[in-house]
């Protein structure tokens, strides 16, 4: 929601491509999760937005679903592998030229030693800060639901405290081939409450 090109856009038109000319620095905090009812900032994908900067105008409300322990285990595993790969890329990048030089000059033991160092550093750093959901977080995803696979990748900045039935109604609205509601859903007002 929130894209300025969605206002008065003809039906069956793809929206969400407008650009207000700015993005917002990511504020991803581990205590804010994508539980059902969370309000979060949309953003472009990692390949064009590695800093995970948020859209200056678009947001989304989390509907999601409830999860089993097995499904949550799989999500943890995928996030763990993605985090290790990112860490590996970050650690290897400054050593890449040295590694290539060793390989080109036939110094394979030195090249292997460099790779061993990077792999050991990945394991060490990841062991200090693994991706693991707390028992409370797992329980919320099992009972309330949401989208746990988005945790750690998008800025969550609020939650629905009253009117969860409105989220349910929005989720049931028929959408077109662009995943846009066939009939516009207009937010007439909001109230912000500080915790």
Question: Can you name each region flagged by the protein language model?
Answer:
Residues 1-195:
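Cyclophilin-like peptidyl-prolyl cis-trans isomerases
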